[in-house]
Amino acid sequence: MAKMSLSSYLLILTFSLFSQGILLSASKSIRNLEDDMVFNTFRLGKALQKEDTPQKSVVAPSLEQYKNDDSSFMNDEENKNSKNTGSKHNFLNHGLPLNLAIKPYLALKGSVAFPAENGVQNTESTQEKREIGDEENSAKFPIGRRDFDMLRCMLGRVYRPCWQV
């Protein structure tokens, strides 16, 4: 009885493993067909665009360079002569192409772009806020001194509570 249940479990296990492999290969081949359909429609659209516009225009890059190696996992035709070259090869060949005409950084706007000009406005607004909130302490200490004392209190280097600053 134990031998029969063990063999039935092994039979179920092998069946499930083989069915997953077949499903995986079928899904990979279906994905390859869908990818090829997308690439063909893109090529057709690009060809029609070239025929319609006689003037010189910027040509969009082909989608073939973005095709993953994962899509050819179970494809025997491509795997016959291929070898594993590692992640460096995949990164260099399937990365985005560099467009050197575009700057690699974003243009900064507002107060971040010119901090020297806006620094005067920022200090004036903070001084107004402090004068409104600390009318009793504004006569005793200059603003820089109050900030320094508050920072020292928050760091814990002065042996007094922060409310005394």
Swiss-Prot record:
Purpose: MCH may act as a neurotransmitter or neuromodulator in a broad array of neuronal functions directed toward the regulation of goal-directed behavior, such as food intake, and general arousal.
Cellular location(s): Secreted
Intrachain S-S bonds: C153-C162
PANTHER family: MELANIN-CONCENTRATING HORMONE, PRO-MCH
Region Disordered, annotated ranges: 68-88
Entry similarity comment: Belongs to the melanin-concentrating hormone family.
Signal peptide positions (record): 1-21
GO molecular function: melanin-concentrating hormone activity; type 1 melanin-concentrating hormone receptor binding
Biological process (GO), any one: chemical synaptic transmission
The protein's name in its UniProt record: Pro-MCH
Post-translational modification: Pro-MCH is processed differentially in the brain and in peripheral organs producing two neuropeptides; NEI and MCH. A third peptide, NGE, may also be produced. Preferential processing in neurons by prohormone convertase 2 (PC2) generates NEI. MCH is generated in neurons of the lateral hypothalmic area by several prohormone convertases including PC1/3, PC2 and PC5/6.
InterPro entries in alphabetical order: Prepro-melanin_conc_hormone
GO CC list: extracellular region; nucleus; synapse
Keyword set, alphabetical order: Amidation, Cleavage on pair of basic residues, Disulfide bond, Hormone, Neuropeptide, Secreted, Signal
Modified residues (Isoleucine amide): I143
Pfam family, one: Pro-MCH
